[in-house]
């Protein structure tokens, strides 16, 4: 719609350029110059006067087009078929995650094939692999964002389809690469993890997530509003708010999807402390592109083209000299790259 708006805007701006040469030509070939001149002047004035009314009409038309696209997206969500709720729901008593020969496809495109692994409470299971390999899909299926075609996914020995959605969501906390924050206060954004939490509990979660100090430096502390008339937070600060939210929820299962993506030299240490506070005694599924962040995971699953190609600890996978070893070597090599300026080189 923006392209059409710009095109019509350009055409309207060009009307006087089109009228002038035509009017000049008509005046040169007119039998009566005096009789034709008022008509030419009228068209010149008309071409300028009609510009702004037509521009408003085109602008409104473009907004209507934009609104119709937004309505279509909202309708797609509202009319999305809900997942079936179990008739006799069961509630897990522990947080072991089991994938048993899971196959899944987006419409007709198969993205996971015969995935099997077990993640026990108090352990970290890391998923690594190239973009599009299926890592995030595995994490999302753990929360039953979609139903699978074949196989079974269980939490505490209970298939996901037999767990009520509300109970399942209470079992899982998420920290994503891009963390949604709402146009509300910092305190309410953290309290999204536990709507009944007190102000003291919110502050304790913020301290554990290493974000209390930067929150107190904001104009109104925990009552500072985010965005829309308030402040804007950096990517690293948003992630630590999301970690505080997950700490406050205290769910037994934790899914981390590139949770340290925005960590830099200044806040990486704080981010690691926050994550250590978050993952204690939980079943953790962690997706990472930087292998240094998951080298201490209890098990690492190397996902490639929708399949688990390798499985083991960091040292075990290095000894296999397979995909993981190649990825580790590539990361180590890239960390030694230098930026050259003339005859000087600066090591990264």
Task: State the predicted function of each range.
Residues 1-44:
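A hydrophobic transmembrane-helix motif
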Residues 3-8, 49-77:
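Cytosolic ends of transmembrane helices, especially the final helix of ABC transmembrane type-1 domains
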């Amino acid at each position: 719609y923006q392209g059409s708006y710009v095109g019509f805007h350009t055409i309207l701006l060009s009307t006087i350029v089109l009228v002038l040469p035509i009017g000049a030509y008509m005046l040169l070939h007119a039998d009566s110059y005096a009789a034709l001149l008022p008509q030419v002047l009228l068209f010149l004035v008309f071409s300028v006067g009609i510009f702004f009314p037509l521009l408003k009409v085109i602008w409104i038309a473009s907004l209507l087009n934009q609104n119709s696209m937004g309505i279509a997206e909202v309708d797609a969500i509202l009319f999305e078929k809900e997942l079936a709720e179990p008739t006799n729901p069961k509630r897990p008593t522990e947080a072991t995650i089991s994938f048993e020969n899971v196959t899944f496809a987006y419409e007709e495109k198969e993205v996971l094939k015969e995935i099997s692994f077990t993640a026990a409470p108090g352990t970290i299971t890391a998923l690594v692999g190239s973009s599009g390999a299926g890592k995030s899909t595995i994490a999302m299926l753990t929360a039953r964002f979609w139903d699978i075609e074949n196989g079974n996914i269980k939490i505490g020995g209970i298939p996901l389809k037999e767990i009520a959605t509300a109970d399942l969501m209470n079992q899982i906390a998420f920290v994503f690469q891009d963390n949604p924050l709402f146009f509300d206060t910092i305190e309410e954004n953290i309290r999204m993890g536990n709507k009944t939490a007190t102000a003291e509990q919110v502050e304790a979660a913020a301290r554990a997530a290493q974000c209390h100090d930067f929150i107190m430096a904001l104009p109104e502390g925990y009552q500072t509003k985010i965005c829309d008339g308030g402040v804007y937070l950096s990517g690293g600060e948003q992630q630590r708010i999301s970690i505080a939210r997950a700490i406050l929820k205290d769910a037994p299962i934790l899914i981390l999807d590139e949770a340290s993506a925005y960590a830099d030299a200044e806040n990486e240490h704080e981010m690691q402390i926050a994550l250590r506070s978050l993952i204690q005694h939980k079943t953790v599924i962690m997706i990472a592109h930087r292998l240094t962040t998951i080298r201490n995971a209890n098990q690492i699953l190397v996902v490639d083209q929708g399949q688990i190609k390798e499985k083991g600890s960091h040292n075990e996978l290095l000894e296999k000299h397979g995909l993981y070893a190649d990825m580790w070597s590539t990361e180590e090599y890239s960390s030694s790259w230098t930026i050259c300026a003339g005859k000087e080189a600066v090591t990264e």
